[in-house]
Amino acid sequence: MITAVNRPAALHINLAAIKENTRQAKAHLKPGQKLFCVVKANAYGHGAARLAPVMEEAGADGFCVAMLDEGLELRRAQIVKPILVLGLQPAEEAALAAANDISLPVSSLDWLKKAEKVLRKEGLQLKIHLAIDSGMGRIGFSEDEDFKAVNEYLQGNDAFFVEGMFTHFASADSADASYFDYQVKRFKHMESLLTVKPKWIHVDNTAAILFDKDVASDIVRFGIGLYGLNPSSAPGSRDLEPAFALKPAMSFVSELTYVKQIHKGYGVGYGSTHIAEEDEWIGTVPVGYADGWIRKFQGFKVKVGDTYCPIVGRVCMDQFMVLLPKEVPAGTPVELISADPAAPNSLRRAADWLDTIHYEVACQFNDRLDRIYDNE
């Protein structure tokens, strides 16, 4: 997808905020713990290749990604620190990962057997992390016998280096710690079955650290907090207070490209879902659902100049319209998303409007949007 650098619409990413969030996370670790910055999904929409060096400078000890291709992107960006893929990859890609010093997760004995054939053929050793399903229900070993079989298979097997063992918490961002405690107990049980001792045991995610639920983890996988966003932010929920202040890094700005007056009874947008109740001023903004600004944003208020104005009519593929209180000139700045967490158009408020989480909103902003990096 081409990046539209010649239109007046861009995501602004505050590098000073990214640095500060990374430093704060690093400072909050216990002695000996490593900080692995999670930059999957293009750093939650913020730009992984651009931000990873910034995080590295601010103290990152390694990086986590969702898939091998994301790890390869970091290597091309000259990142040399450890990279862990969190999602399962085809066994056929084991050699490519090993050749680029990228660690892969393991969830089955069958995968190991297939990967070993590939590695033996190329004369390579792969760093692996054993994934444990302690209660997320997603990937990982959950049955004792399966895990014991893998443990036995890895004894003396030089095709693999058991670098880590990990799990992921389903509810570390909840005030109710009962399920969190259950997962910790289940993980420790699985750990007791392992005689091939990993270099790193890691369970802590952003929520576990921000809400002081650290479980003696060698690595902290710090994700959404890097971008200044509170993981405890489901729609309608009460945010848990983080252990340190977070600084949102993303804002989304554009401008009015066209302003016109319409008369009473005139329709706006596909399906004419807005009908003017009187003579009205309508402004057009050159952003649409093809950029990730989806149709459900109809009715949401964006900041035009100093005034919050509702989106009227259905959001189009490449444009949307706003109802203005009066005539304003084309070229007037429009702030779609504010980096101020208290603003009515913050990423959190946008997520509330869409009945989702801010993770999803940030990730849906795609590569057609230019990303401008400020405050270097």
Swiss-Prot record:
Task: Write down the required cofactor(s).
Answer: pyridoxal 5'-phosphate
The EC designation for this entry is 5.1.1.1
Q: Which cystines does this chain contain?
A: none
Which Gene Ontology biological process is one annotated for this entry? D-alanine biosynthetic process
Q: Which residues carry this modification: N6-(pyridoxal phosphate)lysine?
A: K40
GO terms assigned for molecular function? alanine racemase activity; pyridoxal phosphate binding
The pathway it acts in is: Amino-acid biosynthesis; D-alanine biosynthesis; D-alanine from L-alanine: step 1/1
CDD domains given in the database record: PLPDE_III_AR
GO CC annotation terms, alphabetical: cytosol
> Catalyses which reaction?
L-alanine = D-alanine
Q: Pfam families recorded for this chain?
A: Ala_racemase_C, Ala_racemase_N
Keywords attached to this Swiss-Prot or TrEMBL record, sorted alphabetically, are: Isomerase, Pyridoxal phosphate
Which residues does UniProt mark as catalytic?
A: K40, Y270
Where substrate binds, per the record, is at R138, M317
**Role:** Catalyzes the interconversion of L-alanine and D-alanine. May also act on other amino acids.
Q: Which family does it belong to?
A: Belongs to the alanine racemase family.
Q: What is this protein called?
A: Alanine racemase
User: What is the scientific name of the source organism?
Assistant: Lactobacillus delbrueckii subsp. bulgaricus (strain ATCC 11842 / DSM 20081 / BCRC 10696 / JCM 1002 / NBRC 13953 / NCIMB 11778 / NCTC 12712 / WDCM 00102 / Lb 14)
* Gene of this entry: alr
